[in-house]
Amino acid sequence: MRRALFSCFCGLLWISSGWAADPLGTININLHGNVVDFSCTVNTADIDKTVDLGRWPTTQLLNAGDTTALVPFSLRLEGCPPGSVAILFTGTPASDTNLLALDDPAMAQTVAIELRNSDRSRLALGEASPTEEVDANGNVTLNFFANYRALASGVR
C-alpha cells in the first residue's frame, strides 16, 4: 500500500513539473470593432417640419431678453429600441451661442430663436434634451417649444 502511495506521489511530482515548463512569453492581441447606437427614424410627417413662430411687432422685443409667446411643436420618432431617447438641435448659433441665429440677419439683427423643453426650460443649442421613454411599439413623441428672443435692445 505504501509503495502504491509513493508511486502516485512521484507521478504527481512528475506531472506538476511538466506544468511548470517555460512560459509562453508575450502575446499581443489586437481587437477591432465598432459599437453603434440603434437609432430611431423620424416619422415621415415630421421630416420637413415648419414651425411658424408668428408675426410680432418690434415693440414685443424692446429690451434684451424679451421674448415672444411660446409656440409648441413635436417630433415623432419610430422604430426606436426599448428604453429612452433624447435629441439635440444643431444649427448656426446666434451671438448667444445657446440660441439659433435667424437665416436672414437683415430681417432682425438682434433677435434669435430660443428652444425650450416640454417643461419650458431652455434647451441650449447642441445639448441633449431630457430623455423620454419609448412605448411598447418603439414610438415616442418629443415635445418642445420655440420663441423669438431679443439679444439686445433696439430690435430692428
Residue ranges of model-derived segments:
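Mature extracellular/passenger domains of Gram-negative fimbrial/pilin and adhesin proteins
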Residues: 2-4, 19-156
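Bacterial N-terminal signal peptides
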Residues: 7-16
